Structure formats: structure tokens, C-alpha cells
Design a protein with these regions (language model features):
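Aromatic- and Gly/Pro-rich donor/ligand-binding loops
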Residues: 5-17, 21-178
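Alpha-helix N-cap/helix-start capping motif
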Residues: 24, 190-191
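Alpha-helix capping/helix-boundary segments
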Residues: 133, 192-193
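Short, structured coil segments at secondary-structure junctions
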Residues: 152, 182, 200-204
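A short beta-strand/loop micro-motif in the catalytic core of glycosyltransferases
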Residues: 183-190
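Helix-loop-beta element that forms the nucleotide-linked donor phosphate-binding surface
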Residues: 194-211
Length: 211
């Protein structure tokens, strides 16, 4: 019997050990559960290959202080690229080697928000997680991480996803409620996430261990 396919979207390719390990572990556990899983190669907004668009901006009014912080991080990132040390280059190379040997990615790489929504990959089910994929402090449109690009007839679930905060800003609550309702099943990493989902939607989320 052919295995059911699962497409996973998560935070990856940001040269961070935690992000790399959680993405590998999520894919690995899906495979161990009997599914044919692969990672949707959508570049996170912090990846230098990601192309920003108007539609990829945060889906709620972003606080000025957070915008200033994001701009500061952007400047620091550009400076680091100019004066990139051999150790940083080596680290990036090792991450790329890890991807080749241990991760399985979608055939197409999505560098833009519009690419993902206009031509989404096809799977039997879609998963988001783990990591802080729902953190409202992220300066990007979180719709991809709520699987809004997925056809409504498909199974959409989160696995050990994290908000990274204990509450959602009032200005973003409407969007979060709508996005959470888009998911067929909800699994979160922290107990506070269970409470937050209940508070926002009245739904019962499953508290599950980060893979």
C-alpha cells in the first residue's frame, strides 16, 4: 500500500542548531509513524534568499519598537555578511551538508510568499511545526505557518507548534482566531499554548512533546 504523504512547513535554513534539529526530528517522527514526509522548502524571512513582498508583511499592525528592532537585526545581518568569518562560512557549509544527507525537501523551493500561494505543493496532509512558528513578534506574514496556502479539502494539522508568548496582542487576535480555525487538528509545544488556543477559539489543543 502506498504511504500517505505529509508536507511539513517549519522554520529552517536560518543557520540555527535548534531550528535544524527540530525540523529533522519532525520529519523523522512522521516517517517513523508510517508516513512519507518531506519538508516544504519555503525560505523563512530571516533567510537571505527570501524575497520580501507587500503580501508577506505581518498580517496585523506591527509595533514601532518591534520594527526598529527588526531593522537593527537586518543591518547587523548585512554587516556580518560583509565581514563573514571562516568559522561562519564553515558552519553554513556544514548545515548545507546536513540538509543533503538528512532532510528531504519539496522539489520546488519557494523564495516568495506569492510563489507558495499561487503554486502550492500537493500532499495528502499538511503539517506545521515544531518551533515558534506562531510567534507574533516575527516580522512576516504568518499565514504560511497556519497552512493558509493549503486547499480547504486537505487535512491540516500542527505538531508541537509554539506561540513563543503567553498572550496575543489585541490587534492580532482576529487574525489568529481565523488562522487557528483553519486547522483540522492543533498540537502545541507548551501548556500555555493549550490555554491560549482555548482562550482564542474555544477549541481543545493537544499538548505534545517537541520531537
Amino acid at each position: 500500500m502506498k504511504k500517505k504523504t505529509v508536507g511539513i512547513i517549519t522554520i529552517l535554513k536560518v543557520n540555527n542548531y535548534g531550528a535544524e534539529l527540530q525540523s529533522y526530528a519532525t520529519q523523522r517522527i512522521m516517517n517513523l509513524m508510517g508516513y512519507d514526509a518531506e519538508i516544504i522548502d519555503y525560505l523563512y524571512y530571516r533567510n537571505s534568499g527570501h524575497i520580501k513582498e507587500k503580501c508577506s508583511m505581518p498580517f496585523y499592525p506591527y509595533p514601532v519598537k518591534n520594527r526598529i528592532k527588526e531593522f537593527g537585526l537586518y543591518v547587523i545581518d548585512k554587516i556580518e555578511k560583509i565581514f563573514e568569518s571562516d568559522s561562519i562560512k564553515h558552519r553554513k557549509m556544514r548545515f548545507e551538508e546536513f540538509h543533503k544527507h538528512f532532510n528531504r525537501f519539496s522539489t520546488k523551493q519557494y523564495r516568495k510568499y506569492s510563489e507558495l500561494f499561487n503554486n502550492p505543493p500537493i500532499y495528502d496532509a499538511y503539517c506545521v511545526g515544531s518551533d515558534q512558528v506562531w510567534n507574533p513578534r516575527c516580522y512576516t506574514n504568518l499565514n504560511p505557518y497556519f497552512l493558509k496556502f493549503v486547499p480547504n479539502i486537505s487535512i491540516k494539522f500542527s505538531y508541537a507548534s509554539s506561540f513563543g508568548v503567553k498572550d496575543i496582542p489585541d490587534s492580532a487576535r482576529k487574525q489568529y482566531i481565523e488562522c487557528l480555525q483553519n486547522l483540522s487538528y492543533i498540537g502545541v509545544r507548551e501548556e500555555t499554548g493549550v490555554d491560549l488556543v482555548q482562550k482564542l477559539t474555544g477549541r481543545k489543543a493537544t499538548w505534545c512533546l517537541d520531537p
